[in-house]
Amino acid sequence: MQKSLITKWLCISCIMVIATIVIGGITRLTGSGLSIVEWRPVTGILPPFSFESWQSEFAKYKAFPEYNSVNYGITLSQFKFIYLLEFIHRLLGRITALIYIVPLIYFYFKDVIKNRDMLPYIIALLLFCIQGFIGWYMVKSGLLNSPYVSHFRLAFHLIIAVIIYHILFYQLIKNRCDILLILSQTDFKLPLIFSGIAITVVYVQIFLGALVAGLDAGLIYNSFPLMDDRFIPMEIKDNFFDLKNWYDPVFIQFIHRLVGYSVFLVVVVLIICLLKIEHPKLNKIAYFLMIVLFMQVSTGIITLLYSVPIIIASIHQLFAIILLSIIIWCYFLIKSS
């Protein structure tokens, strides 16, 4: 009964974290992230209701660079749209944190989760607590002289969310899944290595994806597989190792493509390793990986070719999390055996 309760709690928490990540991506893609220019952790749980309240929020927004440089002349109705998207993202983050923290306290004091098992839950708790500060730290970077948030802070904000999800999902499968029943002579060395490498490169790719979004790097070089008939674009060919390139959307898009190829190759090798073991569970994971990898690559290419359509770009981000989840599941099963 207690195990089932923890499973349901972790499952809901994981779904909420994914939803918050996806809504956060949509908020960025629609340029809504700077519409709320204050951070009120407690009083900010309610949106404006009256016409006067909306006018007040709109007036605050007009005092910052994004209105004057990007959205000058937008109507109150247009402002309400971007405001409510950012509001929903923040509210979802608060609700997700509460859904995680309140039951965790209950489980701890009821000794449902033993002290020896508490460390990952505490780490996730600390990350939840600082994630709001990181989000505001990111937003503040776009409220100064430039109407754009720091792409590094944006990527950091996303990666913290992914780490939270990783911890919760790992605890979920640890609590829910049975280990593999395989003869001891089965060699797990290669699939274990490649599942670990796959997790690493997917993390790197998610981070780079956030940099692409932060610099609007998906709006240039909308061709595939080459960039303006070249593998390495002219802008970065002669100064490839210059650190300033990390502020250049051309370079960021190129690196995102490059790591994308790496993700594809590593996951394909992992799939081959899993199929060679000939175990039903691992074969099922291999088939899932084939489908999700295909969807991830396809949505990424479509996102690029069509200059970042919001729905496809959001699906692309979602499949990155699904791909990571399946690889984590694979890693757990192999390691537990």
Swiss-Prot record:
Provide the reaction this enzyme catalyses: Fe(II)-heme o + 2 A + H2O = Fe(II)-heme a + 2 AH2
| Needed co-factor(s) | heme b
Q: Where does heme bind?
A: H256, H316
Cellular localisation: Cell membrane
Question: Which Enzyme Commission number(s) are listed?
Answer: 1.17.99.9
Give me the segments passing through the membrane. 6-26, 87-107, 119-139, 154-174, 192-212, 258-278, 285-305, 308-328
Q: Does the keyword Oxidoreductase apply?
A: yes
The Swiss-Prot or TrEMBL record annotates one GO molecular function as:
oxidoreductase activity, acting on NAD(P)H, heme protein as acceptor
- What membrane topology was assigned to this protein in its record? Multi-pass membrane protein
| InterPro entries reported in the protein's UniProt record | COX15/CtaA_fam, HemeA_Synthase_type2
Associated pathway: Porphyrin-containing compound metabolism; heme A biosynthesis; heme A from heme O: step 1/1
Q: What does this protein do?
A: Catalyzes the conversion of heme O to heme A by two successive hydroxylations of the methyl group at C8. The first hydroxylation forms heme I, the second hydroxylation results in an unstable dihydroxymethyl group, which spontaneously dehydrates, resulting in the formyl group of heme A.
Quaternary form? Interacts with CtaB.
Q: What is this protein called?
A: Heme A synthase
